[in-house]
A protein has these predicted regions:
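Multi-bladed beta-propeller domains
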Residues: 1-14, 47-63, 85-87, 94-110, ...
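Non-catalytic accessory segments flanking enzyme active sites
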Residues: 16-19, 156-160, 165-166, 170-178, ...
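Blade-terminus and WD-like Trp-Asp/Gly-His loop motifs, strongest in beta-propeller folds
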Residues: 19-26, 64-72, 114-120, 202-210, ...
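Beta-strand C-termini and the immediately following turn/loop, strongest in propeller blades
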Residues: 28-37, 68, 74-83, 124-129, ...
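Structural motif
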Residues: 38-44, 83-91, 132-137, 176-178, ...
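Predominantly five- to eight-bladed beta-propeller fold
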Residues: 43, 128-180, 225-230, 278-281, ...
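Cap/lid segment of the alpha/beta-hydrolase catalytic domain
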Residues: 387-506, 513, 547
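Active-site-proximal cap/loop segments of hydrolase catalytic domains
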Residues: 465-654
Length: 654
């Protein structure tokens, strides 16, 4: 068997956005792959029809699409090139029976979504900017004025609201998405939603008479990004906008789905903070009355961690009045349905269903099953694509051994990967990997970095402590960071060492990112059991995180279970920086300079504290990367990251 190499994630092809044609005779989806030489990702559209799979495009930048009709697909792209600065968006159409893609639509603003209408027109979701709200009209003088203003002010940032930047982006500057109607004959856009409001979650009714969407007022100093968004609809004949239902603290709307006879709202009561899971509610189309439909309280969508997933897709869809949806339960994500107020499983296996579509009783699921990267499966669970067979052929893929234990009044679920060429009685070093979130889960899925370490001769252990997803409010961690979660992690580590005598307790290493980075920082201040640790994109100080993260004020107060004024001592108690003078463990810190979720100052603080106290430490910073470095960062940067962590552990082996 050959080992998994450090750059093998570049040979993985990731599938996403699987979508049936209007009549269900074909399906399209995207396939993405990292390209190490060009240090980028390429994405193409693929077609599944009659049991055959073939590439539909070859440009390498096709990631969003929709069906124009049964035999034509519309996708975003830019094959023309621009000689001057431009905001222009272009969409191309291609026939499923072959031929070249043709330019179909050109818009004067950045466009993220289009919804084809039966009359040949479109609904369009596009970006607009404060002070230049009429850019959608295509006035060249206004476009020039926009770029002149941008250049004139490029040395300044004027901040007037929270959050003032977003992870991986830049300062918010109040940009927002609006809904437009596109007249195909006149080739013109008409604004449907007012300036100063951000549109999201747009859904077109099946009869195409009404469009629904969430709306958020972004003109105020502190938009309610985490307070749920209000649901509106527009009658396309009259262009009249109507409020359908408002979010409130005890009814935080996450999303919704359009059924045949009612609208299904997924909303949380907020009893467990911003991570409260949703229940289901029925909304009458005529009266707009909202009534409880089903108590659920579990996660909707997949939160199973993975580093070979690129792209998204549907997590739920209504078929008549039956909701099909992905839900994370315990250590995996499966497909379920809600019918007549009752939830039941449809297709649940070890691993994760990442997205799906359903049409005329047929289904296609993009899933991480059988310890393989993503493939497509049908409604019976039969695999219908084989994109990643070749990359796994002849390679050692460690199979996860479940390890569950009782810790106090709850169970902790986890997994063990054995090293390549494992021999009973022989000692092996151990890497303990802690997930982010904390409201995510580790599951039995192909995780490149873990497989790489197993191929390098390490045991890899990982688990889902208190605070993880998949178990409803039972795992609530608010106000308890560094207490029960720390106890769970240490208990799991103890159990793993006891069950596998081949694990070398003198060569025990630990790493984690985001919440896992917080726990790494906490661990090194509370135990010396690890030979070396690697803290990635971490939180070290809740009092400063409050003011620098894009989610700082909301997330820090929610997760600390209090308000920073007057309870600053509680925030400090839960901060790893408070205990930095106790650290003895050699620690590597990795941060991305455009990570505004867990900003680099958090790493600076811990690194400075360790050096000041004479503890061996190293800080590695990545330019041009953000919070997603380990999952979608530039391929060469991902390799460097993994080399840094692995090299740090190798350097400190006993």
């Amino acid at each position: 068997m050959k080992p998994i190499a450090i750059d093998d994630f570049c040979t993985v092809r990731s599938l996403a956005n699987v979508t049936f044609s209007p009549e269900g005779t074909s399906a399209c989806f995207t396939v993405s792959q990292a390209k190490k030489e060009k240090n980028c990702y390429k994405s193409r559209l693929y077609l599944l029809k009659g049991g055959r799979v073939r590439a539909l495009t070859g440009g390498g930048k096709e990631s969003s699409f929709c069906y124009l009709d049964e035999n034509t697909v519309l996708f975003a792209g830019d094959r023309e090139g621009e000689k001057e600065p431009s905001l222009t968006s272009r969409f191309y159409k291609i026939a499923l029976d072959g031929g070249e893609a043709d330019l179909a639509y050109t818009f004067p603003i950045p466009v993220s979504q289009v919804f084809p209408l039966k009359n040949g027109d479109l609904l369009v979701v596009g970006s607009t900017f404060p002070g230049f709200e009429d850019l959608y009209k295509g006035d060249k003088k206004l476009v020039k004025a926009y770029f002149d203003d941008k250049k004139e002010n490029e040395d300044y940032e004027v901040i007037s609201q929270l959050p003032w930047w977003w992870n991986g982006g830049t300062y918010t500057r109040g940009a927002y998405e609006s809904l437009f109607y596109y007249d195909a004959k006149k080739k013109s856009l008409t604004r449907l939603t007012d300036a100063g409001f951000n549109v999201s979650d747009v859904q077109l009714a099946e009869d195409q008479k009404t469009v629904y969407f969430s709306l958020l007022d972004v003109s105020v100093p502190r938009p309610a990004h985490f307070g749920g968004q209000d649901l509106y609809r527009i009658d396309l004949a009259s262009r009249r906008q109507k409020l359908v239902v408002k979010s409130r603290p005890d009814f935080v709307i996450a999303t919704y789905a359009l059924g045949k006879s009612f609208l299904l709202v997924m909303a949380a009561d907020g009893k467990f903070g911003m991570n409260t899971d949703c229940d289901f509610y029925k909304l009458d189309y005529e009266t707009l009355a909202v009534t409880p439909y089903a108590v659920y309280g579990e996660a909707i969508g997949s939160s199973v961690g993975c580093d070979v997933r690129h792209g998204g897709g549907q997590a739920f869809k209504m078929d008549g009045d039956v909701l099909y949806f992905i839900s994370t339960r315990f250590d995996g994500a499966g497909l379920y349905k809600l019918e007549d107020g009752t939830v039941s499983p449809v297709l649940v296996r070890d691993g994760s269903v990442d997205c799906f579509d359903r049409k005329n009783g047929k289904m296609l699921l993009c899933a991480l099953w059988d310890m393989k990267p993503q493939e497509l499966y049908d409604e019976t669970g039969r695999r219908v694509t084989h994109f990643n067979d070749a990359m796994l052929r002849g390679k050692y893929v460690a199979q996860p051994d479940p390890l569950n234990l009782t810790a106090g009044d709850h169970e902790v679920h986890g997994f063990i990967l054995k090293p390549m060429d494992f021999e009973a009685g022989k000692k092996y070093p151990v890497i303990f990997d802690i997930h982010g979130g904390p409201k995510t889960v580790y599951g039995p899925v192909f995780y490149h970095e873990m497989q790489y370490w197993a191929s390098r001769g390490y045991f890899v252990i990982f688990c889902n402590p208190t605070g993880s997803d998949g178990r409803g409010a039972f795992m609530d961690i608010r106000g308890k960071y560094g207490t029960v979660d720390f106890d769970d992690l240490m208990a799991f580590c103890d159990e793993a060492l006891a069950k596998y005598p081949e694990m070398d307790a003198d060569n025990l290493f630990e790493t984690g990112g985001s919440y896992g980075g917080f726990m790494t920082n906490w661990i090194i201040g509370h135990t010396d059991r690890f030979r070396a640790c690697a803290s990635q994109r971490s939180i070290s100080n809740w009092t400063s995180f409050y003011g620098v993260s894009d989610i700082g004020p909301d997330f820090s107060e929610d997760q600390c279970g209090s308000t920073i004024w007057p309870d600053v001592e509680k925030f400090w108690w839960h901060s790893p920086m408070k205990y930095a003078d106790k650290v003895k463990t050699p620690t590597l810190f990795l941060h991305s300079l455009e990570d505004y979720r867990c900003p680099v100052d958090q790493g600076y603080q811990m690194y400075s504290a360790l050096i000041a106290h004479g503890v061996e430490s190293r800080l590695v910073l990545f330019r041009g990367e953000n919070h997603e470095l380990s999952r979608s960062g530039k391929p060469k940067h991902r390799i460097r990251r993994l080399n840094e962590i692995t090299g740090w552990f190798e350097q400190h082996k006993g």
